[in-house]
């Protein structure tokens, strides 16, 4: 699949890397569909895509053309079309997530003013509001974050699918950040092609209902690259920001304000020592 170029303007220039990534992923997905399903299926996907774009841009005749194309498909013939657009949407969302990370890094590298939602901006606002050191310490001493994690009743994505999407995200980040040799760029693009091929060969829906313990195990499997990696980073960022806010807090040991029984269960399931906190 390919993506139509967006209008070029100064206001959209910062979105150029996002458009580049989406075009890359769309091109790889299109190549995958052509190699796995045949040229005729690829051409049908392209017809639907281009006609849908025309309809979105206000060409009313495209509506009847699109209806005619889709109405002529059997249920079996519709499946690769649905899968193509579903996976393209997933890949585009992955690229957009990476773009948000990219923009945040660029702001940090440029030394931009703290942005909404950051700890540093919150501390600046507390300082302007006249909140002193004692009040800050009291806040962190009594603060409590206790997430409640549940299996979403409409979440149907398989772990294998989510794992491949995470792999694509990692490869996009590597492609974006590293100064690569031509050979290394080829390796990254080849890895992207393998990940997207695996994604295409993976059924979108589970054929069997998960047991409760399987849902729990699946949920805990994501802790390695969410809570267990990000929590130490968050505490370090908090302590660094507090020291910047007030030098008297340089040696301040931030209290443990994050509690979660699922985290404790994850440690215990590995045989790791874990306190009640």
What are these regions (language model features)?
Residues 1-277:
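Often metal-dependent polyanion-binding catalytic scaffolds in large enzymes
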């Amino acid at each position: 699949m390919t993506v139509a170029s967006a209008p070029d303007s100064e206001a959209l220039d910062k979105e150029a890397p996002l458009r580049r990534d989406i075009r890359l992923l769309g091109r790889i997905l299109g190549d995958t569909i052509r190699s796995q399903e045949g040229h005729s299926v690829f051409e049908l996907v392209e017809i639907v895509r281009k006609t849908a774009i025309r309809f979105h841009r206000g060409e009313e005749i495209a509506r009847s053309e699109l209806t005619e194309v889709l109405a002529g498909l059997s249920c079996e013939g519709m499946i690769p079309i649905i899968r193509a657009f579903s996976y393209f949407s997933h890949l585009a969302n992955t690229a957009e997530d990476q773009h948000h990370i990219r923009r945040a890094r660029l702001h940090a590298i440029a030394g931009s003013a703290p942005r909404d939602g950051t700890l540093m901006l919150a501390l600046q606002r507390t300082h302007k509001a006249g909140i002193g050191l004692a009040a800050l310490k009291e806040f962190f001493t009594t603060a409590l974050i206790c997430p409640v994690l549940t299996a979403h009743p409409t979440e149907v994505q398989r772990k294998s699918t989510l794992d491949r999407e995470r792999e694509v995200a990692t490869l996009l980040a590597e492609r974006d950040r590293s100064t690569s040799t031509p050979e290394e760029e080829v390796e990254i693009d080849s890895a992207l092609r393998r990940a997207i091929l695996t994604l295409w060969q993976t059924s979108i829906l589970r054929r069997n209902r998960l047991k409760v313990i399987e849902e729990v195990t699946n949920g805990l499997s994501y802790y390695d690259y969410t809570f267990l990696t990000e929590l130490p980073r968050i505490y370090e960022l908090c302590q660094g920001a507090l020291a910047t806010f007030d030098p008297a807090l340089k040696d301040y040991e931030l209290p443990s304000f994050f509690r979660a029984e699922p985290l404790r269960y994850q440690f215990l399931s590995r045989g790791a020592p874990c306190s009640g906190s």
